[in-house]
Amino acid sequence: MMNRRSMLALMAGAAVAPRLSFAADKPYRLAFYANVGAELWHYDVNIDTAELTRRGSVKLPASVQYAWPHHSGRALYVVSSNGQAGAGGVHHAAVLRLDHANGDAALLGTPVALPDRPINVCTDIPSKNLLVAFNQPSGVRVFRIKPDMTLGGEIAQGKLDGGVYAHQIRVTNDNHHAILVTRGNDPTPTKAEDPGALKFFDYADGHLSHEYSVAPNHGIGFGPRHLDFHPTRPWVYVSLERESRLFMYRLAQGRLESKAAYDVDTLKDRRDFDPRQLAGAIHVHPNGKFVYVANRADGTEDYQGRKVFKGGENSIAAYSIDQQTGEPRLIQFADTEKIYPRTFHIDPTGSLLVAEHNIPLDVRDGKGIGRVQAGLSVFRIGADGKLTLVRKYDVDVGKDTMFWAGMVAVRA
């Protein structure tokens, strides 16, 4: 049972725990990375002008799925896949060494082959272990991280319930628990809905145990995609992909509460809600005062003999966070002015937000047809948490897609 002293220790640990953005406790070089297929591109970041300058790239064994930095800021762990199951599958976890002098990335060691498509990855808080989530079959595997930051062997786990269609794995700020976010699947004319759940585990030195599920209504109508933690309070913010909603849960006495404390909409207008309208990535601002959720839409309809965008919300929903209760309160919908912002990230100072968009798509343009390119939207974050779109970058993806993008504080 967690007493007052242990709860205070947990919160203190959360306050100093490393995050993906990293606290600005030591000099670092800010780098932005975004993929096109198997190529991971590196961009310099100018926070003052909100500009991204593309420098170079490194090629992974297959299309990038997700990435996560070593807590030192000197390496990046990247999972990749060609998306094919069975014998035709090419799935790997790779380590990239990051050069503090220029931010460039280069392979460190040999990529580790994985049995199935990896959809998400993270390290534990001290970066002693790498946790990899797989969507089908749904589950999680854990690998040792060696002192030289390369990957060691897989850590055997007991029997784990991986739910249906895992989409994210995260370790809590105190390093004592892990949450596997399992989205489930919508019903089809021939198949019933697959339930979603948050799979909560005890976590110790790479070992997952004592799993239990948070699944309202037995997971029906509950399709979580991603979550993020408040930096200093025991609050967990969850984006529900299939429902386009934002839930806030509390961590209490070492457990995730079974009922969300708050449930808010992520959409501006639900009158034309479409199955291809989905909530996506979620990030809490480094200062803990705001939380942001991506809204994605890419549904098409026939127009002049071509498939064109049929409408929907492609935006970042911004919320202020009540610092006493954790309640998220809507303050803005910021249009990304591109299609399908699959991922976005915030720099360590909390000044910039960059959203990545997967593919180009034809759109209605007056009486004709135009085209919105894949690419990046760069926003300035105000002191009030609101976003101002500063510039957009078109990216030629050819037959590939953009799938992941993130900021990393690269350290010497």
Which residue ranges define each predicted feature?
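Short loop/turn segments immediately following beta-strands, especially the blade-tip
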Residues: 44-49, 97-103, 144-150, 202-207, ...
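A short beta-strand motif characteristic of beta-propeller blades
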Residues: 53-58, 107-111, 154-159, 211-217, ...
